[in-house]
Every structure is written in C-alpha cells, then in structure tokens.
Amino acid sequence: MFLPFYILDGGFFHYAGDFNSQQISFYRYMNGFIKGMGYPDGLTSVNGHSLPTNTFSWATDLGSGAMNAYSFYLYGSPFFWFSLIFPQHWLPYLMVPLLVLKFAVAGGGAYKYLQRYVQNQNYAVLGACLYAFSGFSVYNVFFNHFVDVVALFPWMLWALDEAIYNKRHGLFAFWVAVNLLNNYFFFAGQVLFLVIYFVCKVSTGECKLTLKLFGHLAVESILGVAMGCLLIWPAFLSLLQNPRTVDLSSGWGFLTYSHVQQYLAILVSWIMPPDSPYMTSVWSEGIIKWTSMSAYLPLCSLAGAMAYWRAQKGDSMKRIVATCAIFALVPVLNSAFYMLNSSYYARWYYMPVLILCAMTIKALEDPEIDLDAPAKGIGWLMLATVVFAIVPVLDSSTGEWSLGVLKNPGQYAAVLGFGLGGLLVYRFICQKWRGKKVFVQRLLAAVLAFSCMFGIVHIGIGKFGQWHTDSDLVEQDTNALKLKEDLPEGDWRVDTYKTHDNLGLWLDKSCLQYFGSTAAPSILSFYPALGVKRDVRSEPDITNYALRGLLSVKYLITTPENQSDFENEADSGWEYYDTLDGYVLYENTNYVPMGFTYDYYVTEETYEDSITTTRSNLLMRALVLSDEDVETYGKYLTELPEENLYDLYYETYVSDCNDRRANACSEFQMTNSGFSAEINLDRDNLVFFAVPYDDGFTAYVNGQEQEVIEVDEGLMAVLCPAGYSVIDFVYEADGLKLSKTVTLIAIPVFVLYVGYFKWSDKKKKRH
C-alpha cells in the first residue's frame, strides 16, 4: 500500500494536508526536543530546590508547554517513544515503517480479540485484516496519530474479555493505562464504548454481572487510569481554557444535524469505501471533510455483518452496533465520544468497526447463514448512490438544467468501482469455495489484494490532488534545515509568507505561522481579541504590521517564487536582508527585542471597546490590565489618555516601537524550560514578555519568586524593582506534580496486585 509512494518519494514519504504539515514535522521535531537538542537549560535550581528542564517548546506557535501541546499527537504514544532509538534526521524517512508497525499492531490486537469468537483461528486472522485495513484505518493515514489509537484499542477490548471470561488480573489495567497515555482525547470515547459494550454483554446474558466481577473491573479500571494519568491531568487543566467545547445552548443542534446530507453521508460511510479526507465526491453541505467518517470493511463492506444480523436474535454484538448507529445519528450522543466537543467528528468509528469484523467472520464461519442476499442488498444500496450522478439540477443563477451533483466524478467512480468490485469478488469466492478448507485462505488473499489496491488509489487521490502545492515540500523542509544553521544568532521570532506549514519546527524558531490544534490555550484568546482567527492554526495576515513588532519578529522568510507577491502585499517596515538556502529573508526594521516596559496601561474594558483592526498598534503603546491587576499594579503605570487611543497609524507605531526598544531587556535568552532576561530599570515597573500566559509558569526576579501577571488577554508580565534585575521564567505543566505522584504510587500497587494473583494462582494449582 505504501511501497509505490515510498519509492516514488525516495524514502521521504509525503501525503497531503495534516500528514505533511503536522505529522512529519512533529515526529522529527519532538525526537530532537526530547533528546535535549534544542535550546539550552535555563534556571535549574532555586534555594537548593531543583527546577524542571526540557519542558517548553519555543518552536510551537508563540511558545507552548511541550507536554500539553503534543500529548494529543504523540507525547504518550509508544510508537513515538520507540522512534526515539533512531536519530532525529531519520524520522522523515521512518514515517512509512512506523505506519507499517502500527498496522501490524492493530492486526495483532484484533486477532487476539477475535479469536475468542470463532472456532477456526484462520477466521480471526481474516477479521484482523478486515480491521487493520478498514476504511477508517486507510482514511486516517492522513492523520497518522489516529492510527496509533486504532492499533492499541483492540488490545484493551481483548483484555476486558479476558477479565470477564477468564478472570485474568492485570491485563485490563495495563491496557487501560497504555490507551490513556497514548491519547486522552480518544480515551474518553473508549470509556463510553466500553460501557456500551459491557452493558450490552450483560443485558443479553452473555456475561453475568456479579459483585466480584464488578469489583474486579472497577479496581482494574481505577488502577489503569491511575497509572496512565501522567498526561491527562495537565491536559485537562489546559483544555479547561480551550474554547473548543460544546455550546450548551445548542437547542435543536443537540438532537439533529442541520443538513440532511449529513445523515446521508453517515449512512453511506458505513457501506462505501471512503473519499479522500479533504475531497468529497458528492456532498456539498454538512461537515464531511477531515471527520474520519468511515466504517467500511474491505472487499465485503457490511455484507457479512448484515448476514450475521439477519441470522441472530438477542445478540450483544447487534445491540452494540445498533447503539453505535443511534449515537452516530444524534449530534449530542456523537459528541459524547469526544467530551462534548463542539466540532463534528466520526473519529470513534474504529470501535464499532471491530465489532463489525467479529460479526462478519462469525457469519462466514457458520455454514447455515445466508451470505448472498445481504451482499446483493449492499450492492443495490451502492448502486443507488448513482442517483447523485443523474439527478437533474437547476442552476438558480443561470436558469440552466444539468445532470448530477457530483463534486469529484473521478473519485466517485473509483470509490463506487471498488465498492461494487469488492462485493462481486466476495460473492464469487463465497459461491465457489464456501464450505471448503481453502475458503478462508481465498477470502483472506482477496481482502489483502483489495486493501493494497484500494489503499494505493485512496492515498494516490489525496497525494496527487495536492501535488501542485506539495511537490516542493521535501525541498523546502530540507532547505529549512540548512537555513537553520545559516540564520544570524539570537533569540527572536520569525514569520513566513507562502511557505509550507510549520517551517518554524524545522528552524527550531518560534514562528507566527503555525498549524496545530493544541498550542498554549491563551493563544486562543490573544489572537481573536486582535481579530485574528485561531482555530487549528495561527496565520495572522501580513498586513497586521504592528503584531510583528509586538511579538519580536526579526525576520520574514519566503521563497523566490513568492518574493514579488510579498513586496506587493506587505506594508512598510520590511527590508531585504539576504537570499539563503533557497529562501528570501526580509528584516523587520521595527523589530523590538523580547522583554520591554511601558509607561501606560489600558483596562480590558477600554481595550475591548477599541477598534479591532488597530488593537495591535494599541498594544505597542499600552499594556492591557484586568481591573484586579489595575488595583495592584496600576500605580506603576499611567492610564493612557483618551486622546492617545486613536492616533494609531504606521508612523505612530514606529515611534512606539522606538520607545519600547529604548526600554527593552539588555539580554534575553530562550531556554528549554522558558526564558531568562536581564534588564536595568530607573524605577519599579512591569516588564512585558510576548509569551503566551500559562499557569505552569513560575517567575523569579533576582532569585525570588514573583507573581506572573496575565496581560494583553493572553501574554505575560512580571514586576521588577528599580536597578539591575535578572528574570527567569520556568515552566512545568500545571498539574504534572499531582499526576506524576499518582502514577508513581499506582505502578508499585499494580505490581503488587498482579504479583498477588500470580502467587494465588500458583498456590491453587499446588492444591
């Protein structure tokens, strides 16, 4: 599936979208960060107490705590930690081998789970391949770290079955911990699914709920969560500040989707192979792209599962799938798999997919179950989608009629062709070899061949659909590594113009252009207050010149191809610097070093009443303080006169930059745990740092702890006395001490717990 592209790309496999912009960059960057290859240590001890190091990533947006920024992506992933045995510069070339490993682990876990439900273990192998190469798995290569979840979940479900049916101790707790560490966001959905799974098992009488079993599962659940909570408590405290949660005033939005097409897309996603993540074949409304909406099983679709459904009554698997279908169709229930996240996703479908695999292989193994009729039914449903290609459409603007609502006819034809072709092969094999020893081998071979061919086509559609923009990705990324060595020395930020995403991660520099969902939460309040959209990326427009001075941007980086566009679009304040390593550099003539003081402040109310488009200019003139901080720190500054709230032009911005530069830190150094600075003041004053506020920061001024003040609706300041001061900001994720303590206590408890039952089992065998 990956080999043709691996060869084509010379080992540096690149796909499209998130995979190119985030996954390659994150894996390579964090490999070096964990190994301490970035910024130097900062303040390491105060009054004999050691301080944390290697906790803060400057290259992540405006700077973010590394653990919270990457725990959603890779920080707890065993696959990422395994990759640390390789050198950092190998990582872009290891993305495919790591994906292969993840698919193998997914298949192994699915096999362990499924073998309980069939007599012939070859059917478990078949089911494992159906799961590993499901439409969900192939689709989510685009996101890469979602495949980690797909790989590890079956092991937890297998461990739950082992606890229920074989009374094994320790396995479930272990896999709960692994899955929680791997991804806290997906784990929330896994907990809900396990509850549905267990309730359905009990309600059908497939397992008997006793006090002993309940206690067993409760203890192991708590123990597993305790061992795996290392990342979740800091992440939870960080997420509390994140606005991407459910709107509790949604009303009907709780119960129904706003577009009929959303329902059709959900239903079709269970029977048809998936579209490319960023390219829909049919749908023009609803939230479809990037949602991971696919529950398709390779070759057979739902034919086997539906055959099982028709043949069984009162079965737990049917109840699980039926419950999941209801959850998929009701918005608030769907979002329950993601802690009531307000954005629509279908990224939990991999769990019912595993149950569908179990239903499929049970139907295939049972000679009494009719396989052909459901296959025909699924085929007719697939054919019914042809109506999208022939339905007459009236263009309201031209008054002309046309046929079809297809957005991408070529992709639709490929998806439909694979869907119908797979069913035809499935029916042929079932009719020719069912009941013979070679049946399962023939079907397995067909599933693998189909998965390989569809995977190549699916990835190819996504890859070459963006080839016009991504063909120079490898060149830009490798050139950035050269540029990193050739940039002038110093600790400042950069900006980019029409380059590939996340260039700052390759330069190990804080960059205003950043693509990532989980940067410091205060960024998500700072930028919107300036009228800059911040959802999953930061990309302030180049015309916002004042923001570059405020955030200490010294250089802007673009490509020769985009140089003229930049010069036409940019305002004054940029001066050509040099052409280096395939990039063109411009220097900010209004650069202000990090860490400076103000003479004036404005209240948050005044700031929020000001004109949004000139707020960046205002921030170069005055510090924004909350009413509470005005009472405490207002005496060190003067409230900005009203007449100075409006003369916010480029010329006055240049003057304000000169004033800030005249009162800036004489030294500023970025460290792997925050930053340190030196400043000489003629009076007590607040020193401002354009660094995202985070509860995890502790400030030290001349070795004494000082309060960190949140200013400008998301940045930081600290009070310093008159004269020379040394300032240190040290970061440790808020809540980490508590979660670390719980984990360190839980691990030896787990060892004793497992050891006790091992000893008890041996004792029983002797007697």
PLM features: what roles do these ranges have?
Residues 106-113, 152-164, 192-200, 302-308, ...:
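Transmembrane alpha-helical segments
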Residues 636-767:
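Active-site-proximal, structured, solvent-exposed surfaces of multi-pass membrane proteins
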Residues 98-99, 103-116, 122-164, 168-203, ...:
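Membrane-embedded helix bundles of polyisoprenyl
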